[in-house]
Amino acid sequence: MEGPPLSPAPADNVTLNVSCGRPATLFDWADHRLISLLALAFLNLMVVAGNLLVVMAVFVHSKLRTVTNLFIVSLACADLLVGMLVLPFSATLEVLDVWLYGDVWCSVWLAVDVWMCTSSILNLCAISLDRYLAVSQPISYPSLMSTRRAKQLIAAVWVLSFVICFPPLVGWNDRPGTLIGSRGSSACRLTCELTNERGYVIYSALGSFFLPSTVMLFFYGRIYRTAVSTTRAIAQGFRTTKEDEEGRLTLRIHRGRSVTQRAEQAAAGGARAHGQVRLTLSEPGARRQNKPSFVVHCREDSRAKNQYEIYTVVEGDSRPGRRVPQPQRPAKKLSSASQSSEDDSRPPRFISRVSRRNVRHQARRFRMETKAAKTVGIIVGLFILCWLPFFVCYLVRGFCADCVPPLLFSVFFWLGYCNSAVNPCVYALCSRDFRFAFSSILCKCVCRRGAMERRFRRTLLVGNRSQTEEDCEVAD
């Protein structure tokens, strides 16, 4: 069904001829309609401009090209498509209270609406998984969530979102069309609404919101537990590194003041840095005097970057103060010590690998990952806050069509759309990198516009001078 033509209208109202008994008066230009139109147009502009700025920031600034920001770009693309393909038609329908674009585009528009909103929340699920891996497994995170796997996960998100929005296009709906009323009546009008078919309402509500929200809350619960335990471990100075049925292995780190001072002096003077770190391995149930304990002396060679000369002083050895030299090797993460002694109570003879990064660096990295998780947590919380009222009403309306007032449903409907404009604001407030990228892009645009205006004015000025000189020559 093609969009019906608009007929000439008086100044105070608009009419639409839909081949009914007589033209139906749709609305008059009341103040509240004009205010609604301006507000919805401003919201649409915010959605498009904000999310376009996010995409540009990630692609322009190399510092923002991280795995996590791939999911952020995917989320911004979904919100950007909402602003470009959904909101203009939603605003028209909201203000005019009539659908002007035909039955085919009505079906496509509804499907795109569900597709983009579903992809937004599934992208948030992927982001919560990414943050959980980054906080809980920081060492193996780069291999677990590589760029290739992130792109595969993003593709799966968009395909699954399309699976949820596709059924109404092939007939799983109860929508008879865009025409309400009979053509012989003077009250008939065109509309485009979501289906109330109970089966699809349950299917789409669970797949688009409730199940993904449960998954996100689960991951953020685990992130919170991991953050609390890691913060406590940093404060107490030990960390459980292995746990099984036989027991757990605890690594205690004693870092003296002299180690840091010597390292800083060596870094400033370019000399060799000598450091000492005491490590204690303990198991539950073992007596205190049997704890394996040893001291690692690290000497950094300034001539060979990232190289350590390692000596291990074994406490409790029959030859006190014995040094076991180890060859120089690139600094790597701390691994379990080799133990070749027949007695389990004897300390390890050497450490196979010693990390160059100290506890302070690990704590700083953990704080960065936790801050990123907090930012994404705010985004998830705002998403649930904006969309939960709508999906509750949407689910209730599938069982009782008259139980939800149209005005309330419309308010919650647009509250969900507001979420697409909120995310860029969260990035600007919570992320220094995004804030810097936004400001630099906007400054470039403003400066470029100013340069173009100055060039245009200069061209006009030169042209006016030339014209004046020609006029003077003619007069002479």
From Swiss-Prot:
Keywords: Cell membrane, Disulfide bond, G-protein coupled receptor, Glycoprotein, Membrane, Receptor, Transducer, Transmembrane, Transmembrane helix. PROSITE patterns: G_PROTEIN_RECEP_F1_1, G_PROTEIN_RECEP_F1_2. It is found in: Cell membrane. GO terms for molecular function: adrenergic receptor activity. It comes from the Eukaryota. Residues 61-69, 128-152, 222-375, 431-476 are cytoplasmic. Gene3D superfamilies: Rhodopsin 7-helix transmembrane proteins. Signal peptide: none annotated. Pfam families: 7tm_1. The chain crosses the membrane at residues 37-60, 70-93, 104-127, 153-172, 201-221, 376-396, 407-430. Its main location: membrane. InterPro entries: ADR_fam, GPCR_Rhodpsn, GPCR_Rhodpsn_7TM. Belongs to the G-protein coupled receptor 1 family. This is Probable G-protein coupled receptor No9. It comes from Amphibalanus amphitrite.
